[in-house]
Amino acid sequence: MAEISTDIAAMSFEEALAELDLIVRRLEEGKGRLDDSIVAYERGALLKKHCEAKLEEARTKVERIVSGPDGSVALQAVDNV
């Protein structure tokens, strides 16, 4: 599979997901040319990969607030979500 292009790499999660959704809808209609559908499918796969990477990045940043026995509050990274 091709590397994620610069334009996709610069996208936010929301932008990539919106474009991926648009591609899926177009492919489901099945009205386009085969060659165009293949190009769209490949781009969709790259967008999916980008979205998964963004979600993983966000997951590693998630923290939860933990209350200590003395009432103190601390942040603890979530290991498995």
From Swiss-Prot:
Give the main location: cytoplasm
Q: Can you supply a Gene Ontology BP term from the record?
A: DNA catabolic process
Stated EC number for the protein is 3.1.11.6
Q: What is the catalytic activity of this protein? A: Exonucleolytic cleavage in either 5'- to 3'- or 3'- to 5'-direction to yield nucleoside 5'-phosphates
Tell me which UniProt keywords the record has, alphabetically.
Cytoplasm, Exonuclease, Hydrolase, Nuclease
GO MF terms listed in the record are: exodeoxyribonuclease VII activity
Task: Name the family.
Answer: Belongs to the XseB family.
Q: What is this protein called?
A: Exodeoxyribonuclease 7 small subunit
Q: Can you name the source organism? A: Paramagnetospirillum magneticum (strain ATCC 700264 / AMB-1)
